[in-house]
Amino acid sequence: MPLRIIFMGTPEFSVPTLAALVEAGHEIAAVYTQPPRPGGRRGLDLQKSPVHQAAELLGVPVLTPVNFKDAADRQAFRDFNADVAVVVAYGLLLPEEILSGTRYGCYNGHASLLPRWRGAAPIQRAIMAGDRETGMMVMKMDKGLDTGPVALTKTVPIGETMTAGELHDKLMHAGAALMKEAMVKLELGELPLTPQPQEGVLYAAKISKDETRIDFTKPAADVHNHIRGLAPFPGAWFELETAGRTERIKVLGSEPAAGAGAPGTILDDALTIACGDGAVRPTRLQRAGGKPLATPDFLRGSPIAAGTRIC
């Protein structure tokens, strides 16, 4: 029989999983998502999350508690009498009363190979660390931060030039298929649970503004991983002095390149940039207020001479 599911998620990453559960014939009793946030050009309009919008199209009740500190919100969750809660990038901590508030508990779709990269930014951190693979896991949630037993795993390779945005999309769809499979096995009583290893724990801290600036004194491999791990958002950047003013330029893609020089020096007309060891060549750039451009197109409008130092 189909399961009665409470779905909990917020960003675009969560939407394919919700759609997959509906397609599989499960009953979505309710959708929980974060409250609408100020948005629009002036930040005056309240914008609903991608999951909120998807749920409304499905005609499913949507709840947007700020947290679960209010007893009425916790009771409302239990009153749905759901078989299971499916959680994908919800963004709120769940108290034990919620974790145990359905027949089978809460199952989370997490974008890493746990216990590596527990926490808020597993996709970015995996690329920034130079990992060659990552994956999606379905785990049963407990009171710890991504510490629960693992049910299913799908490994996904990370290409040498793959950006966080590209990996996000691969994992988003892999996660939807994996959760769909997990719910079938849960229905049949055949969903295995394996405790996470005690070794290899790493935490994927939220990306801070302070770490988005590119440090060209680092080895080229680290700079390349930094750039692609932050692309397209929030975007790694450098500053360039032009016509007596400082301009910030985002680098949304790069490739390793041959070359050597003082870190931050432009080595040729293709914008190869010297690093602490080796060099990188940006492949996609964006200036403030502009649209992303392939580097040759960017340089056609704004050439940067070899020998220029960037900071």
From Swiss-Prot:
Q: Which GO terms describe its molecular function?
A: methionyl-tRNA formyltransferase activity
Q: Which GO terms describe its cellular component?
A: cytosol
Q: What is the protein's given name?
A: Methionyl-tRNA formyltransferase
Instruction: List the EC numbers from the record.
Output: 2.1.2.9
**By its UniProt entry, which InterPro entries does this protein fall under?**
Fmt, Formyl_trans_C, Formyl_transf_N, Formyl_transf_N_sf, Formyl_transferase-like_C_sf, GART_AS, Met-tRNA-FMT_C, Met-tRNA-FMT_N
What is the documented function of this protein?
Attaches a formyl group to the free amino group of methionyl-tRNA(fMet). The formyl group appears to play a dual role in the initiator identity of N-formylmethionyl-tRNA by promoting its recognition by IF2 and preventing the misappropriation of this tRNA by the elongation apparatus.
Superkingdom of this entry's organism?
Bacteria
Give me the reactions it catalyses: L-methionyl-tRNA(fMet) + (6R)-10-formyltetrahydrofolate = N-formyl-L-methionyl-tRNA(fMet) + (6S)-5,6,7,8-tetrahydrofolate + H(+)
- Which sites bind (6S)-5,6,7,8-tetrahydrofolate? S112, L113, L114, P115
| Family listed | Belongs to the Fmt family.
**Keywords, sorted A to Z:** Protein biosynthesis, Transferase
| Organism of origin | Sinorhizobium fredii (strain NBRC 101917 / NGR234)
The family database entries (Pfam families) matched by this protein are listed as:
Formyl_trans_C, Formyl_trans_N
